[in-house]
Amino acid sequence: MALRAEKKAATRTAIADAALALFLARGFDRVTVAEVAEAARVSVNTAFNYFPTKEDLFFDRQEQVVQRLAAAVRDRAPHESPVGAVRRLFLEELDRGDPTLGLSPGAEAFWQVVEDSPALQARARLLAQLAEEALADALGGALGGPRWRAAVLAGVDRALHAQIRDRIRAGADPEAVRAEVRAEAEAAYDALSKLA
């Protein structure tokens, strides 16, 4: 059974990698799922079995992205506040250069493809909404009360990600961006800790 799971994971990765390479080279709207399948050496049906929509091919880590804040809150230590858990998560991601932050080489090309595609912009907004909803569910047991807490916490996370994206797209040095964003994150989470 482990071999089968490994083969499925390898096929999924091959399809996602082929899709991203084509999208970065030609743009999202100029690539078909059939071309992705051909590049990944699978059938179109196989591509759709792994990725039900073309947008799923581009945002292949969407479930991880949607659940990251909620998982940090759910999995935190008993003494750690929800704000502390999200702060720790973001700073750990920043320290290790997590690919979803966009500090890696080529990140500006990824975000240019999103900017050029209304469909991808809409999907990015949907993913942000779903992440906020997942966080609200996770916070329900931790903080109770109004949904604004999840909106504020998710909003800070989105703002920090946007700062990274905008600075990298403007050609800033990734290490300088990392330092700037760390200072902003520390200040933002300090302020948020007073709300919880």
Label the model's feature ranges:
Residues 43-51:
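Short hydrophobic/aromatic patch on the recognition helix
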Residues 55-65:
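Alpha-helical DNA-contacting segments of helix-turn-helix folds
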